[in-house]
Amino acid sequence: MKRFFLYAVAISALCSSCETEDEAFATETNNQTNALHQAKGVQANNYQTYQSILNSFVYNNQQTHQENLLLFEQHVNRQMLNYVPQETYRYEKINMEQLLVLQQADTNFIQQLSYANETKQAIYAIIGNKFNSDMVQLITTESERNLMEIMFALHSNGNGNDNKWNDKRSIAFAYGSQYSFTQAVLYAGAIELLAK
């Protein structure tokens, strides 16, 4: 645990040395918060983790979209090492055939997901902007309740909807979450990369 804390401190010092004073303060504060969460064994907010991983990826317009997807896959897997114990970490790939399906998916795809009916109804409600907090209480598993919290934040994302990606990002996140958080980040992030 000390080793992770020392790595986090070293990385924050390295990253903040090249930034302006305001950026350095924000980055340092954010890294200290993540290090504190890791040191205490508290799981960081998955929505913030998703945003952090996505925002730290630099799309290279000199390369093809396919090459950028591979770089994104590698980036996500490297970043996940900061959020999961190394003993449980395993490299996860984007299945390109599944990504093509998700790029074409609409709300009918939600029925194919392996969640309880209450969770599927909540996903429909989030996408339709009809979600309310009472719906979460109907969901019996903690992992699916956590998914709803993340999806609500992801769908709202400060702008009230996910229309930029025609709800495909939210559907991709829900699909990936069936398997792991890493898969959710990979597929939802890959959908976001389409806009670049």
Language model regions located:
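Sequence-pattern detector for short linear motifs
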Residues: 5-6, 123, 172
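Enrichment for repetitive, rod-forming helical segments
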Residues: 9-10, 152, 190
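N-terminal propeptides/leader regions of secreted preproproteins
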Residues: 18-163
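Hydrophobic, gly/ala-rich membrane-insertion helices/peptides used by toxins and envelope proteins
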Residues: 155-196
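Bacterial Sec-dependent N-terminal signal peptides
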Residues: 1-29, 195-196
